[in-house]
């Protein structure tokens, strides 16, 4: 669907009519497009990776060659394919296809088989192709390899999925995991940077450098830097298998092309013919190469190959020159296939580096979206897959060598098939990556981090679930930096990154979210025809000489390839022509359109848009119709080296719609759910984005099919009477997160200070904000018996008195049964011995058995050994539970006030919540006041008000609009009413502001956090009480508690809390030498009786009359022993 059409068909305003629609319970014919778009970047990138990208990756894997018994063996992966998830043949089942719900229920991984065609050759002679299973790799839900792909809602429901299932995640051991989108440096573009830490890389190194993030067609990435040295030379820095290497630039230039030194000199000084310092520096760099005796390209290659081949692990028969070429293919400008193109790019980077070092240009800002791109899940998946396939080839050599040590192995098809089956499968590395988020890689894949790549897509509520697919993270390494530069919100982020939705605290500014109208387009586009088009517009090819001097021309780049030069005076005209071609879709520029066969036939209006290429934003760009896969040419004026033009034609881009089309355009999806957010203080909107994700809501409709560790459910959710139009655009009424409450702003009691709130007890008894927690536990009897023993099954012995009629004959509790602490939970039998076992319910919290699922093994032949028990824990709001409005106004429930004592209006209505008016002045959440008036008028007139930001202004005031509606209903214009005291019955003198506000109950509940302990377990080392609620630990008595006792004048209580009740112990000490370690109990001779008293003797003094006992903390004794191990003596003065 076109970008424009998706945002033209927005709801004109919110409505409640679909809540009373007779066909409300009937699944629609198609899924909601708006919800599917939220995960499109994840799904499309994975589709590209496993289809087109996989073939590119296979072609990029070089043949693996090694010597075996004086023969040269070559293994090449010629093709690979991933199949949809299915059970093996011969499995006991009704259907071979595996669906995600089955993997969630069984806590297994949703994966498909990866098979490859391996070509093998001996001494260069091809011998055949073997099809080999390499392992099972995870499959993204709703991708083209998923069995749910393109299924309508009705069929999705039949397969136990949500009708609006969006996909975009993996299922690993039954847990939904999302690969984070990461912000990476802009690909294939030289970025000038100043880094003071670069001075520590070697003698003479400076802080000036030019960095480039080189990315191949299959997304393999390598970071490369040019460093400016104090003597005027340049060092080339690259990474190979996580090891840093430095190479003088002259060697790299000389090895890439067979140019003479004079030709290299002339290419480097283009545009700087009058700069004597630069010319001398170039001469010196070339002179360094000559001093090593390298005069030709062949000599340079031999020189580099001889020194680097020890790190490359190449066969012995590779000559040094080929080893050097292998190094350049893997590490130097890997996005370019031609060595000549690499040469021209290095020359351009060198000129840019000298311009930066001499102050002729500014450094590029790596924190700007201009110089950034997004790493999508499919890219990470493909990069990791390619590396593991290369590792598999290496494991075959290792397996072959091990086999040859034991037996005589000949190389033939049959033996190779056996050896291939001994290779390292890809199953466990992929599951480890997605389960932990930690990257185990020999090369590092060009990342700056190796952890935090994946997160759990927890369904605490629906908007929290959505946020996982819209977030982009800057990187874990940036969180450790002390500077705040990386966290700043720059102006060019407008329309791409949400200025509201970012966490407060450590990840602030690093974990951002895409705006609602921002898209990550993942289609790959080819650019082969663009250079010819540029030449027709007046661009001089790179190997030709322009009519004007090079200093009067701009270099032109296309995907990191220097394609030529353009006259400065002609450049604006060329740029305007390219933009016109893209806007009008003229036939001569049809190659710029990659949208499809009919893309050039569609009509498009010339609408300005910012369209960054490769996920990066370029200031001042204009483009029309940024559909999927379109080509775009970029002109970057005022850039570092020469104000050069930069054309980007392929890759991954962000696009957003016309500025001004939507009032909520710059905001993220969740930020768009905040009513009247333009009337609130900005930090309150940030808080609501976080608290909205902590709300106990209605995250899904298939509770009976889920086996999550913990799920929350709001029992009585409601549709808000006041909401933005985006709420209806995403059909959030299917997944509500709160309740409409009558809120009176009044200081009625003393229990509502510091944001606390009073709740009407009658409302509480009628189910206000009542919720439940669903907890699932897997019970696998195979973990309880020894290996080889298969005799345990669920069941109970007839007449077992321990069961107390609370377990069924199958040993499991009854559905709907109430469980209390100590009740029988489940039972199982040993079929060999006939012995019965009963396990009791250990939680202190009462619950109800909601459902029980019986699970089998992968082949369907498992016995009755594994079940999943889901219990429901009712959670009525209790004192201390946390609530919040949609405006960042959070507070705890401080008191359930009797309805008889609540204030009431003249119509007899009592509020559900009493809110302290002191919460408004400092927070400045005017949006909540407006919502109260709007909710009140909506309830009176039977309407649903639009709370989209910026629909009201000073000329069109929200107060007047809603005030007039209240006045028309017979109420006060300002939303106030006269209330009567519930205690005295007398009318209150002040007018009380009362209305309807949508309130959220947060997951932070006292029932999950309270701790009570008198005595209990202690730490084995320090002998202090252990901490932690799950292990019945104590509550930490910290510095603030200590200060509170001191302030109350009860300082001696500290002796009891911190000593007597902590780790008090009695120790023996030598008064004379002051040692705690030297007193030892004397060893009795065999003639002594067991009843005879023994004395403590000091091993240093040799006396027993100087031993005394003292009370000291046990941790002090441990500390003294640790110091003694470090040869440090502690001497005590005993008084």
UniProtKB/Swiss-Prot annotation:
Positions with a binding annotation for Mg(2+): 755
Residue sites binding Zn(2+) per the record: 1070, 1073, 1098, 1101
Cofactor(s) annotated in UniProt: Mg(2+)
Organism: Rattus norvegicus (Rat)
Protein role: Catalytic core component of RNA polymerase I (Pol I), a DNA-dependent RNA polymerase which synthesizes ribosomal RNA precursors using the four ribonucleoside triphosphates as substrates. Transcribes 47S pre-rRNAs from multicopy rRNA gene clusters, giving rise to 5.8S, 18S and 28S ribosomal RNAs. Pol I-mediated transcription cycle proceeds through transcription initiation, transcription elongation and transcription termination stages.
UniProt xrefs under PROSITE patterns: RNA_POL_BETA
Protein name: DNA-directed RNA polymerase I subunit RPA2
Subunit structure: Component of the RNA polymerase I (Pol I) complex consisting of 13 subunits: a ten-subunit catalytic core composed of POLR1A/RPA1, POLR1B/RPA2, POLR1C/RPAC1, POLR1D/RPAC2, POLR1H/RPA12, POLR2E/RPABC1, POLR2F/RPABC2, POLR2H/RPABC3, POLR2K/RPABC4 and POLR2L/RPABC5; a mobile stalk subunit POLR1F/RPA43 protruding from the core and additional subunits homologous to general transcription factors POLR1E/RPA49 and POLR1G/RPA34. Part of Pol I pre-initiation complex (PIC), in which Pol I core assembles with RRN3 and promoter-bound UTBF and SL1/TIF-IB complex.
